[in-house]
């Protein structure tokens, strides 16, 4: 076992803070309408240009192992906020930095970190409740377009596209982002279906960076059987290999020898194959497999229907233009099923919805209907260069996530204003607290003004002056950093989803409180490199 080095108390916390600052200072230059870009060096190909907090955070690895721990903890804040809300990663990083900075001052001054943590948690809870009170529901297309445009760094064109996509497939529809072969960014609606089952083995992925498997024009084998013996699969595998196309297997399960054979063939490049478990359970699983079969123009290979897997023919397999498989979901795009058969199936499901008395069944039937009839909207991103394309694609993904979050929990004034305006609620809480708990709440009160301060400073103005002025304005009014004037934020279209703002604050406080309560850091001791002395010339 390698030797470890340990540091304690103040020294440990200072190292963590240095790591937090290194990461946060890099990320926060991108915040706001006048935020700058960060260029990331790639080992292969051109450098990447990013304006997105989590993308930048993921690239940062510090040399000092203790400082690196601090940076990795804040990276966790950005990643967690991105996972939950899909946006707000820069805001959460800025908040975490502010809470750590203020908190460490107090811990150094003798405050008890555990009680500080309690105060921080209480203040965050009050702030989140206040954000929910300020929330305005998002219903119109105009509101959706504004949310999307802001998240895409004030790009109106992207805002319109996302709003149009949501309008086409509905708020629960599936929207994916692909790279276009042209210079233009456009919207395409594709008949498609998504279900919540991912690949059976991670060895099946085709894109290791995104951890997803993409099969173009695959055959699709649909069966309700558990496949473990490779003998059952061999006949159909041989037929597919002869055709030279990828294969997607949807089965109750694929395991043992059969799974090993598929993985080995995939890794050797003999056959591009992916397997997913069938969605749903019991009778609903049979119905969903039937839906997939109708959508792709295939048949369900089931012994109940007198079809054995070892006798399966190519004609029984479904087909689609593309299948995308992630860890927990699969999307079938442009199935080859006949539109007549799909129409009949949709009509049958609608009849079942009318006849059913159970709310649960109705909900599940409506889900199936949306999957069959709703389709998938594809935003095809076009740009002049590869670097611009990647940057634009990231912004569109951000905009999509922000918009979904806005539809879910509503919106509040953007530009860091809603957070600042939770201060009144926090002040009320502070009056009821005492000692270090009160100090903890005051730390959060100070931290919630940091995003606004940062946006203003990125615009080249004095943060403190603007923060003081916004404090005196009515709720929902704040500072437009683009035009440099005080406005009604919602009317001016400067808005943030509640879910994004709330997640940013909750995740930042959670990690920052961990850093404040840290008393020791343990890391591996770097091995000393031995210098081999050059041979003496006399020895030659």
UniProtKB/Swiss-Prot annotation:
<keyword id="KW-0413">Isomerase</keyword>
<dbReference type="GO" id="GO:0016853">
    <property type="term" value="F:isomerase activity"/>
</dbReference>
<dbReference type="InterPro" id="IPR027409">
    <property type="entry name" value="GroEL-like_apical_dom_sf"/>
</dbReference>
<feature type="binding site">
    <location>
        <begin position="87"/>
        <end position="91"/>
    </location>
    <ligand>
        <name>ATP</name>
    </ligand>
</feature>
<dbReference type="GO" id="GO:0051082">
    <property type="term" value="F:unfolded protein binding"/>
</dbReference>
<dbReference type="InterPro" id="IPR001844">
    <property type="entry name" value="Cpn60/GroEL"/>
</dbReference>
<dbReference type="Pfam" id="PF00118">
    <property type="entry name" value="Cpn60_TCP1"/>
</dbReference>
<keyword id="KW-0547">Nucleotide-binding</keyword>
<dbReference type="GO" id="GO:0140662">
    <property type="term" value="F:ATP-dependent protein folding chaperone"/>
</dbReference>
<dbReference type="GO" id="GO:0005524">
    <property type="term" value="F:ATP binding"/>
</dbReference>
<protein>
    <recommendedName>
        <fullName>Chaperonin GroEL</fullName>
        <ecNumber>5.6.1.7</ecNumber>
    </recommendedName>
</protein>
<dbReference type="InterPro" id="IPR027410">
    <property type="entry name" value="TCP-1-like_intermed_sf"/>
</dbReference>
<comment type="function">
    <text>Together with its co-chaperonin GroES, plays an essential role in assisting protein folding. The GroEL-GroES system forms a nano-cage that allows encapsulation of the non-native substrate proteins and provides a physical environment optimized to promote and accelerate protein folding.</text>
</comment>
<dbReference type="InterPro" id="IPR002423">
    <property type="entry name" value="Cpn60/GroEL/TCP-1"/>
</dbReference>
<keyword id="KW-0143">Chaperone</keyword>
<keyword id="KW-0963">Cytoplasm</keyword>
<feature type="binding site">
    <location>
        <position position="415"/>
    </location>
    <ligand>
        <name>ATP</name>
    </ligand>
</feature>
<keyword id="KW-0067">ATP-binding</keyword>
<dbReference type="InterPro" id="IPR027413">
    <property type="entry name" value="GROEL-like_equatorial_sf"/>
</dbReference>
<comment type="subunit">
    <text>Forms a cylinder of 14 subunits composed of two heptameric rings stacked back-to-back. Interacts with the co-chaperonin GroES.</text>
</comment>
<comment type="similarity">
    <text>Belongs to the chaperonin (HSP60) family.</text>
</comment>
<dbReference type="GO" id="GO:0005737">
    <property type="term" value="C:cytoplasm"/>
</dbReference>
<dbReference type="InterPro" id="IPR018370">
    <property type="entry name" value="Chaperonin_Cpn60_CS"/>
</dbReference>
<feature type="binding site">
    <location>
        <position position="496"/>
    </location>
    <ligand>
        <name>ATP</name>
    </ligand>
</feature>
<dbReference type="GO" id="GO:0042026">
    <property type="term" value="P:protein refolding"/>
</dbReference>
<feature type="binding site">
    <location>
        <begin position="30"/>
        <end position="33"/>
    </location>
    <ligand>
        <name>ATP</name>
    </ligand>
</feature>
């Amino acid at each position: 076992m390698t030797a470890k080095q340990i540091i304690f108390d103040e020294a440990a916390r200072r190292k963590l803070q240095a790591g937090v600052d290194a990461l946060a200072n890099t990320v926060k230059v991108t915040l706001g309408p006048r935020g700058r870009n960060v260029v990331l060096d790639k080992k292969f190909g051109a450098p990447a240009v990013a304006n997105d907090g989590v993308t930048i955070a993921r690239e940062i690895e510090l040399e000092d192992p203790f400082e690196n721990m601090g940076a990795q903890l804040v990276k966790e804040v950005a990643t967690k906020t991105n996972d939950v809300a899909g946006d707000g990663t820069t805001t959460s990083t800025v908040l975490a930095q502010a809470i750590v900075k203020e908190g460490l001052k107090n811990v150094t001054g003798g405050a008890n970190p555990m009680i500080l943590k309690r105060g921080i948690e209480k203040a965050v809870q009050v702030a989140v409740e206040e954000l929910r009170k300020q929330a305005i529901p998002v219903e119109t297309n105009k509101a959706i377009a504004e949310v999307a445009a802001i998240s895409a760094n004030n790009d109106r064109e992207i805002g319109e596209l996302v709003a149009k996509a949501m309008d086409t497939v509905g708020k629960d529809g599936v929207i994916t982002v692909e790279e276009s072969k042209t210079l233009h960014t456009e919207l395409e609606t594709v008949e498609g279906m998504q279900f919540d089952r991912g690949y059976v083995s991670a060895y099946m992925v085709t894109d290791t960076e995104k951890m997803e498997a993409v099969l173009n024009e695959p055959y699709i084998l649909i069966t309700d059987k558990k496949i473990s013996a490779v003998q059952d699969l061999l006949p159909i595998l041989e037929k597919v290999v002869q055709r030279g196309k990828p294969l997607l297997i949807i089965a109750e399960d694929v395991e043992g020898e059969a799974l090993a054979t598929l993985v080995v063939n995939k890794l050797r490049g003999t056959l591009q194959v992916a397997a997913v478990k069938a969605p749903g359970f019991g009778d609903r699983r049979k119905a969903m497999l039937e839906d997939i079969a109708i959508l792709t123009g295939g048949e369900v290979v089931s012994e109940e229907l007198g079809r054995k897997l070892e006798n399966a023919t190519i004609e029984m397999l479904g087909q689609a233009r593309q299948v995308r498989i992630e860890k927990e979901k699969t999307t079938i795009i442009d199935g080859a099923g006949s539109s007549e058969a799909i129409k009949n199936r949709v009509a049958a499901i609608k009849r079942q919805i009318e006849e059913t008395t159970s709310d649960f069944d109705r909900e599940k039937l409506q889900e199936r209907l949306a999957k069959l009839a709703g389709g998938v909207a594809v935003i095809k991103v076009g740009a002049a260069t590869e670097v611009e394309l990647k940057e634009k694609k990231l912004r569109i993904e951000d905009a999509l996530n922000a918009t979904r979050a806005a539809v879910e929990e509503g919106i509040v004034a953007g530009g860091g204003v809603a957070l600042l305006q939770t201060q009144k609620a926090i002040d009320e809480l502070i009056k009821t607290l005492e000692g270090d708990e009160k100090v903890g709440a005051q730390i959060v009160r100070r931290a919630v003004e940091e995003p606004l301060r940062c946006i203003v400073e990125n615009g080249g103005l004095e943060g403190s002056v603007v923060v003081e002025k916004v404090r005196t304005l009515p709720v929902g009014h704040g500072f437009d950093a683009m035009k440099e004037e005080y406005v009604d934020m919602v009317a001016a279209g400067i808005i943030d989803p509640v879910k994004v703002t709330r997640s940013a604050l909750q995740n930042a406080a959670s990690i920052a409180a961990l850093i404040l309560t840290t008393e020791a850091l343990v890391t591996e001791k770097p091995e000393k490199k031995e210098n081999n002395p050059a041979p003496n010339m006399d020895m030659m």
